[in-house]
Design a protein with these regions (language model features):
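Two-component histidine phosphotransfer core
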Residues: 1-182
Length: 182
C-alpha cells in the first residue's frame, strides 16, 4: 500500500508541471513573444528529458538542482524582472539523493504566490545537519497566512492540486512523520 501511495503522489507531479509550463508557453505566444516561447520550448524539452527519461524515484541532488535551474529559467522568461533566484548548495552535497522533483513545486509556490508589487528574491540553501540534508527555500514575497498553509496541508482535502501538499506527503512517506516542510 505504501509503495502504491508513493507512486500515485509521484505521478501527480509530472502532469501538474507539464500543464503549467505549456500554459506559460501559450501565454508568450499569445503576446507574440516568439523568441521567448522558443527559449521556453528549449528549456522545457531539456526538463522533460531530465524528469521523464529516468523512471527512478530518487536522484542525486545535483540533478535536482539542474532541473530546478531549467525551471527557473522558464519562469524568468514568463515573468521577467519579477524575481531573482540564488542557490547556495555546496558542491560536496550534489551526490546526496532525494526524491525527484521535490524542490520545483516549492520554488514554484514562491514564484506564483510570492510575487507582488516588488521584485522578490528566492534563495535556496542546502547543508548537512548530522546526517540529515536540509534544503531551505526562502523568499521575501507577500507571504501566506498560517490558515492558508494549514488548508493546503490538510490531509482531509481532496487531492485536486499538487504542489506543497504532494511534496509534504512524499517526504513523509519516504523519511517518516518527523520530516517535511516547515
Amino acid at each position: 500500500k505504501h509503495l502504491a501511495e508513493l507512486d500515485f503522489l509521484q505521478a501527480q507531479i509530472n502532469p501538474h508541471f507539464i500543464y503549467n509550463t505549456l500554459s506559460s508557453i501559450r501565454f508568450l505566444l499569445e503576446m507574440d513573444k516568439v523568441q521567448e516561447a522558443g527559449e521556453m520550448v528549449f528549456y522545457f524539452s531539456k526538463l522533460l528529458r531530465q524528469t521523464l527519461s529516468r523512471s527512478v524515484e530518487f536522484i542525486p541532488l545535483g540533478e535536482e538542482l539542474d532541473t530546478l535551474k531549467c525551471y527557473v529559467e522558464l519562469q524568468h522568461l514568463r515573468y521577467p524582472d519579477t524575481f531573482d533566484y540564488s542557490c547556495e548548495v555546496d558542491e560536496a552535497l550534489r551526490d546526496n539523493t532525494l526524491p525527484k522533483l521535490l524542490l520545483q513545486p516549492v520554488v514554484e509556490n514562491s514564484i506564483f504566490h510570492g510575487v507582488g508589487r516588488h521584485k522578490i528574491h528566492i534563495r535556496l540553501r542546502g547543508w548537512l545537519e548530522g546526517d540529515t540534508l536540509i534544503l531551505r527555500v526562502e523568499d521575501d514575497g507577500v507571504g501566506i497566512s498560517k490558515d492558508k498553509i494549514d488548508q493546503v496541508m490538510n490531509k482531509d482535502l481532496q487531492i485536486n492540486r499538487v504542489g506543497l501538499k504532494n511534496v509534504q506527503e512524499r517526504i513523509r512517506l519516504n523519511y517518516g512523520p518527523g520530516y517535511g516542510l516547515t
